[in-house]
């Protein structure tokens, strides 16, 4: 039996309905920021509240609400949970085999300054992984690397989440941009160009902002040349590639150029003082001794290459998985004539499952009268997590770890991540209930009431969408058309508003419940999600304000920037 979404369930009053829809979100903020609940407790409680409001206020049939939660939970397991397990597993292999000691030494040979390490790994390397894979892999891997180098786990997770602001809109080979073309009818290239005229301002600023968070303004000024090289190289390539190539490659190209530029720059420039966190002076002294003492072990190029091989394999596998024709074959949707890809397509088809969600698939009708498809999307071979697992299998032979130890490390990883994965499953379940019940649309419609000030508040929709769904792609699909319709009604260029949805969304990623859960899982802070949320929330709001100002100015003052 079909059920039609109602966006004003409380007496036809939009504002009252919006207040009801806000309850789960306000509770989640309160649970983490004030009550400091454990992530899985807050996630499950928020899901429960969302289910109650969906059923009692929005009159959503109980079985449909419950099945919507299961749809989200399954997505939380695959691909998101699977990516986290395999990412942490690969990192643990390098630790178990002693290869991470060599990785640490190789990074220290470039710089043992914590500020510069954050720029190289959190900002540049994290952006590369975002462009190649997305879905939590960038924060999980880069944060684990920073912890291995000696960063405080909370700082590592927080810094990587904030650094991930710059690349999110073009993540996973540009999917957030290409996906929104369908519901809006606006060419992806135009949206790519507009986003590429907004985010470079953030990309220049984020490296400086990261270092200020880490060390304060005065310490940040000590390395301003390196910050400039990192941010400007990234921003320039991001602008050029998004405006002249399209949405697929800005992250990958920007990250590679930024990483290479900074590494080369550090060959001939060093900061006057080496920054380390408070409390690590003793270890810092031993690091300096090891770095300058000729008797300390000096690793050869071959040893360094071997140590980095697991992550080089990860990069290669994720990059291959992101190639459109390969990705199509991995999920059984390839229609070309290449022999190998046709064979891969046959395998991928057998390992891709899309069963309809019982009581839900095409059983919910939106305001336009269109039934909404609801399937359990299980792409076993096509998941980036599988690419990382293959890298872990190949790394077994390179690192010479026994199959027994390899299996033991995998079991330990799964055991450690049980509660974080429960957190992820519950918060994604909450996101799906919010969407399928119509609550998220109610909130979007309420923001659209801001009228002429919508030119300022437009990015807030994207921020809200990413907070709810954990994905810039999902936020664009959720609010993209609403952005277009509202923009036309208030005299705003829809290209700007849809781009602002994506640009605003990137600032919400660092406080998204699933992002918080992923980051905590990667650095061993399960149960400490509230601490990380309190760390990132103020930065999220500040960066959102910057995007709102940029969008407002581009409409009223710099309209020539709109393609």
Swiss-Prot record:
Whether Transmembrane counts among this entry's keywords is yes
The species this protein belongs to is: Bacillus subtilis (strain 168)
* GO cellular component annotations of the record: plasma membrane
Give the Gene Ontology MF terms in alphabetical order: lactate transmembrane transporter activity; solute:proton symporter activity
Q: Which PANTHER family match?
A: GLYCOLATE PERMEASE GLCA-RELATED, L-LACTATE PERMEASE
Which function does this protein serve?
Is the principal permease for the uptake of L-lactate in B.subtilis.
Question: Encoded by which gene?
Answer: lutP
The entry assigns this protein to a family as follows:
Belongs to the lactate permease family.
The main location is membrane
Summarize what gene deletion causes: Cells lacking this gene are markedly impaired (but not totally blocked) in growth on L-lactate minimal medium but not impaired in growth on glucose minimal medium.
- Protein name in the entry: L-lactate permease
